[in-house]
Amino acid sequence: MRVLVIGGGTGGLALAHGLRRAGIDVSVYERDALRTDGLHGYRVGIDPDGSRALHALLPTELYDTFVATKARDSKYFNMLTEDLKELLSLELLESTDPVESEKSISRMTLRQVLLTGLDGIVEFGKEFTRFEQHADHVTAYFADGTSATGDLLVAADGSGSRVRRQYLPQAKTEETGIVAIAGKLPITAESAKLVPPKVFEGISLINAPRGFGCIVHVMEFQWDHDGNVKDGIGGNTEELIRRWPGLQFDNTRDYINWGLSAAKDKLPANIMELRGADLIKTALDVTPGWHPNLRRLFELTDPGTCFPVNIWTSVPIDPWESSNVTLLGDAIHTMTPGRGVGANTALRDAVNLCRKLIDVRDGKQELVPAVHEYEARMIEYGFDAVLKSRAQMTSADPVHKPGIGRLALAGLRTAMRTVNHLPPAKRRMRDQMMTFRGADRDELTLDITPAPQP
């Protein structure tokens, strides 16, 4: 059996590791020309679902490297006003378990971790154009005139998936009406003092009038500005980082990143055309009454890291007839960052698909029925996450409406302040948040064994 994976993102690369360990022939085709291409330097939160999936799919030492290269753990989940007054702060549970825990990692770091050990499997500079299906094989064609043939083609090519457009033209994505401006700045003596201690040690959401919001993450890593392991980092972590070849491709250093979001009609009409300094100026223009420290964060941002994001979401569709083409991650269930589970859902897909393909390898199932079982489960939890994420991030939310928006914001703030003074309610809220992020789910264990010898 040969598997063709279109797209070298989180889900596709994780799947490739699992298949490789299972002795299944797999190739990944990535359109970027180099492993360092693309703007991958922002945070991704890996929840217990994602951690279990990576633990199941990656070789043991590579998973340990993933844990060693994550950012410092967040201690708090904070909700604040635009003048940095606390509305709600949840103390997150500390966990020393390398699997059953939340992790923050730079997207570039995660990319380099997942590319480790896949030399000869990932082909760069491969822009997918189309596929052809036949009874016993499928062929992918690329813009450079080459092609590849296998038994199964997996679309892991993101929200703009060309595979999906050809295979499931009825599967659409739509705008949420929300646009974000993203940027990051290095942690310095000045920038570190601009945020309160809980913000520096946590994940923070700012709820402001007119539906404006801003997320702030502080990311500190185990290596310094020169890429050397920091003093005081010893033991296995130090050894793993020193041995990891991916660090030479990783430009990640300690940073603060932020994402300012609002309904599209609250931002300049040409927001998606702006870049760099123009986006920083826009962020400052639309936040005149915000705390000076937040505005200073915007001013200190590296213009080269700033870009606009038009938030899209999938429209759930009915099940389709399964075949030798399937999909995972954003290619089928693009979701807003409202719940922070997009990458984790892609990893969940990768484990479940890998499990089914191992069954095919072992003769327990035929290929198409195995794909069907994977898709039936994936559609259920994937589109559920899409809908719940969209509910958290849409211009249809009352907070974006004139008049009623003020009342909605006032009600939201009152509710958060009330909960903030009720420790049992805070614990329930924290536990509910963690349950949604997979804290109590056990389906993502997978014991990958090599193919039995004939």
What residue spans do the PLM features occupy?
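Short, solvent-exposed loop/turn segments at secondary-structure junctions
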Residues: T10-G11, A22, A33-L34, R52, ...
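Conserved mid-domain beta->alpha element of the FAD-binding
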Residues: V5-D25, Y29-D32, V154-A155, I181, ...
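Conserved N-terminal glycine-rich FAD pyrophosphate-binding loop of Rossmann-like flavoproteins
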Residues: A33-A53
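C-terminal helical "tail/cap" subdomain of flavin- and related membrane-associated enzymes
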Residues: T65-F66, Y76, E82-L90, R296, ...
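A short beta-to-alpha transition loop/helix N-cap that caps and shapes the active-site region
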Residues: R35-L39, T176, E190-S191
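Conserved N-terminal helical subregion
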Residues: M1, G18, D47-P186, P268-A269, ...
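Conserved FAD/dinucleotide-binding core of flavoprotein oxidoreductases
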Residues: K85-S106, A182-D302
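Short, flexible hinge/linker loops that cap or flank conserved catalytic cores
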Residues: S147, F249, D318-W320
